[in-house]
Amino acid sequence: MGKKCSSKFRQMLVLVLLLIVFTCLSVTAPLSVTAKPTSFKVKARGIEDEGQERTHSLNSKKSSRSVEKTHHSEGRRLSNVFPNAGIRAGPSKSGQGGGRIPVAAS
């Protein structure tokens, strides 16, 4: 009977220690990279008031964020451009022959 009590006591002690360690780690753990903070404020070109931020972004032609996206997508598009893509003529899928450009008879 004495061994049963000591083994249960050890199990309970281990569980309590694990619980304490887990709670300490979860409280002190930093936010992950993908997690958003609970409260954050977006500044649009240095304006700090929220009401002014909205009107400023609605009145401006492009917000700084949309300009960043445009530049980013342009760079991506330029890296995928094939200069001779329109000149290549492969086999026809319709069965009418090769992809040649017909020349008008004179």
Swiss-Prot record:
A motif (SCOOP motif 2) lies at residues 86-100. The gene is PROSCOOP7. One of its GO terms (cellular component) is plasma membrane. Brassicaceae-specific phytocytokine (plant endogenous peptide released into the apoplast) perceived by MIK2 in a BAK1/SERK3 and SERK4 coreceptors-dependent manner, that modulates various physiological and antimicrobial processes including growth prevention and reactive oxygen species (ROS) response regulation. This is Serine rich endogenous peptide 7. It comes from Arabidopsis thaliana (Mouse-ear cress). Interacts with MIK2 (via extracellular leucine-rich repeat domain); this interaction triggers the formation of complex between MIK2 and the BAK1/SERK3 and SERK4 coreceptors, and subsequent BAK1 activation by phosphorylation. A motif (SCOOP motif 1) lies at residues 58-72. A motif (SxS motif essential for MIK2 binding) lies at residues 64-66, 92-94.
